[in-house]
Amino acid sequence: MNADVSAFNLVKTTTIESLNIQYEEYEHLTTGARHIHLASDNNENVFMVALRTVPTDSTGVAHILEHTSLCGSKRFPVRDPFFMMIRRSLNTFMNAFTSSDWTAYPFASQNKKDFNNLLEVYLDAVFFARLDPLDFSQEGHRLEFEEPNNPDSDLVYKGVVFNEMKGAMSSISSQLWQAVGESLFPDTTYGVNSGGEPENITDLSYEQLQAFYQTHYHPDNATFVTFGDISAKEHQFKIQEFALRHFAPLNKRIEVPLQDKFDNAIRVTKQFPISEEEAKGDKTHLVMAWVLGNIRDPLELMSTHLLSAVLFENSASPLQQALETTDLGTAPSPLCGMDDSGLEMVFVCGVEGSSEDKLEQLEALVLNALQGVADNGVDTQRMTALLDQLELQQREVGGGGYPYGLQIMLSCLPTAIHRGDAAAALNIDPILTQLRESIQDPNFIKSLVKRLLIDNQHRVSLVMTPDTKLSQQRIEQEQQKLAAIKETLTEEEKQNIITTAAALKERQTVDDDPEILPKVDLTDIPPVTDIPEFSEQKMAKRSATFYPQGTNGLSYQQVITQLPTLNEQQSALLGIHNRVLTDLGVGSKDYLATQNWQTQVCGGINAQSSIRSDLNNEQQVSGYFTLSAKGLNIHNNA
């Protein structure tokens, strides 16, 4: 093992106490691949390999490559290794993600043998993908005749990603975000749709997919991240054995450049499709968006998060309140907030349900709200509460359906992908300490809002107007494109289309040999599962159950009440009751004061209802109402 592990050089190690992890960073001596290991006593081990994927167009090459890389590899030549491994694995998580500038392949397991099985499958899928042309046709795009065996019938486009993106880009939020990216980043990858625009996906060739794979899916463009109680050395032995030893340096540096700053703010108008019936009333979206600092500076990143919280945390926040109460639109834009998923942060605000002629009024409303913060500042107590919220988000264990280790990985991945200090991105305690000192100066938040927003000319005001004819125009354009293609087809090309469709259909009926893939046996599964310890005691005339767990300085509280039998009308209103309950005032506090109070002492209060069967009689069910909250331990008695 030592000979293989020596291929890695330890670059950095540090303890991150708030997360109870030891951060270790290594570099592969041959390829330059980066390995970040987050050592923890948590037995749910997590692995992720992430690659910088920087498309220059909207053909969806990175997205389609994510799909096709999972259609079989050199050692595991089966059609769908992921689905087959789900049935042969004890994994707690398996997936793959495509972002605007990276693609990641994560998994998690609490069983060591299972973890190593999955590691072999993942490494082979990423670095030794088969990329069969037939898989490209299936996952990306292909031509078929409407009647598969009739070359006289019309041509149609098919493909998993092609159809997926047609659905995804039908959402107005997706179209808005894409329009913001195109407007703010005309010269970088954030100006194109990494998932793919349906009208551009069909321009991608198989050869272009292969070329992208050769340059982007190489170890010198990869970042490996591991978490848990398996040592870095063990991981590195496997990574070296099953992947890295087969590669030489590519010497091609892939990165995202910074966008050149605008000299003056711009205005852009775009359209989105809508039906005649939906178009009744004001349906225009008005948004303002800024490019801010880059994420490699942890203080700048956290300061920007703080400013976003100041402006948008709840209905009492100045910008949120302005957008909620204005008659310029029916509601704040779904894009409101700060995005830090790319190299450069983006801040967006605006309204929906408006009209094009109200843009100047919206700009005045937003800039006046920002100027109010610049002139009057923010109460120090509120700033402290918002910093508590940021700390809570950093410390929180679990939630969102993702393993704890994966959440930590994803929180530092954008910084790591852009060759920043991932340890600094994770260890926010020093930054919080610095910010707690900074907010004592009333001018801190005033100067921050001026620098990042008011005086920042890298800004776009976007008008998205509804167009009832656009959807039909796009359908007709696609039909015309297909008709033009059909006119040029030779008899041989027509037959190839029929043959490909038949081959894909036949492939779906072929059963791959599952024994090609590794598996766990019954002997590998522990006979006993961990049952958490608990204790009970009386509190306010009720029985309270306590579960001591390692929660990184947080407390999670629930009050669970059995519901009486509800009639049909009451049942219909229950969801609305749960939705509005936590936004109402409490006691002598109105709803704004209540929201400020929640921000000061917890991470929010949530209400939900559920139906559960009796532990001893599954035929007997009851309804329950649950009120839950989470917060820092220092606020337990609030």
Regions found by a protein language model. Name each.
Residues L452:
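Aromatic-residue-lined binding/catalytic grooves and analogous aromatic/hydrophobic interfacial grooves
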Residues E164-M165, I201-T202:
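Conserved phosphate-chemistry cores used by DNA topoisomerases
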Residues M1-F82, Q110, E120-L123, S170, ...:
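His/Glu-rich zincin catalytic helix
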Residues E44-V54, D80-F128, D135-E146, S174-E199, ...:
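M16 family metallopeptidases and their MPP-like homologs
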Residues Y206-L209:
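Extended serine/threonine-enriched, polar tracts that run as long, contiguous segments within proteins
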